[in-house]
Regions:
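Acidic, mature catalytic/reactive cores of soluble proteins
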Residues: 1-328
Length: 328
């Protein structure tokens, strides 16, 4: 199976996911985003659990300020714990909430508490229920290209997918608590989620019906980027159905290609869709217009969630575009 080329086993029996060939290592964010697709989707739940066991050990070491024994890079990035909870949410859907709670409930609780207690060095939970991150001088999101030591896309402050992930994590954690009869914990999490939901809409939704990419004080980034697809695709979203449809429509019109979603709309300033030339030139194009295939999974999920079977043939046609790449 093509997925197996990314599975890595070390001598001590630790299991990892390689971020890519030829030079990418095992990176925390990439691990949690890709793990469900590289394991659960091909019915390899056991390998999911083995990778998660290694990754959990690494994240506990990070939370406790201990030296890392797990060979996972970028574990300090602020969205890593949020993607970890998302990955476990996919495991719960594949198995059951009860099974997920039994194996990973304590880890999920510890991660949520770690964030709520503001113990992460670059993830601050504000009174409005949103997460704030400093990304001015160092790239902190998946759009992490740098040039001359500075992020090409300096996303900072309230970052749209971080807060969509946070709302989703709170609601998922509440649903796990409900599945095992912990009503007190469930209600506490839902109350927190409600605060986050209102602030998310007030902060990110703009007058044109799409979402700001990030907001930092009076600075609102109007760039049309694919990060707004995440709150449409997640199981728990702070957006209403009508709001989701408007966001999806803009993603379809301005970002969708046969091979993925553009990292920036052609109508936005700085659009650069051609990834060629010397390293610096490529760094400036990396997240400024080039299309990314992995985002299509979330786009397709958003389409099916909103339009059900009426979008099935459309999604199938989108997937056909990847066949040549997969059989190259």
């Amino acid at each position: 199976n093509a997925a197996h080329q990314f599975h890595r086993r070390e001598k001590n029996d630790d299991r990892y996911i390689l971020a890519g060939y030829p030079w990418f290592k095992c990176r925390a964010r990439d691990t949690f985003i890709s793990l469900p697709g590289l394991t659960l989707s091909i019915e390899e739940n056991d390998y999911f659990e083995l990778v998660m066991k290694t990754a959990m050990r690494g994240y506990y070491e990070f939370m406790e300020g201990k030296p890392l024994t797990a060979h996972i890079t970028e574990i300090e990035q602020p969205d890593v714990p949020l993607w970890a909870v998302w990955a476990l949410q996919q495991y719960a859907k594949e198995t059951s909430k009860e099974e997920c709670h039994k194996k990973y409930g304590q880890f999920i609780k510890d991660v949520i508490r770690f964030i709520q207690d503001n113990k992460h060095p670059n993830l601050e939970l504000k009174e409005n229920g949103l997460l704030y991150t400093n990304g001015r001088d160092k790239a902190v999101t998946w759009m992490n290209s740098t040039a001359n030591g500075r992020p090409v896309v300096p996303r900072t402050g309230y970052i749209v997918e971080f807060n969509a992930l946070w709302y989703n994590a709170l609601c998922f954690c509440a649903s796990l608590a409900g599945a095992v009869g912990d009503e007190a914990d469930q209600q506490k999490l839902l109350a927190q989620a409600e605060i986050t939901k209102k602030s998310f809409v007030d902060t990110f939704l703009n007058e044109y019906g799409y979402l700001y990419d990030y907001v930092d004080g009076n600075m609102m980034d109007w760039s049309v980027r694919p990060n707004m697809i995440f709150p449409v695709a997640f199981d728990y979203s702070p957006l209403s159905q009508d709001q989701k449809k408007k966001v999806l429509d803009i993603c379809t019109r301005e970002l969708l290609t046969p091979k993925g979603l553009r990292s920036l709309s052609p109508k936005s300033g700085g659009y650069n869709p051609i990834y060629v030339g010397p390293q610096t030139q490529r760094d400036y194009a990396y997240h400024q217009g080039t299309a990314w295939p992995w985002l299509c999974g979330f786009y397709m999920e958003a389409s099916l969630k909103l339009y059900k079977r009426t979008r099935l043939s459309f999604v199938e046609r989108q997937m056909v575009g990847f066949e040549d790449e997969m059989s190259y």
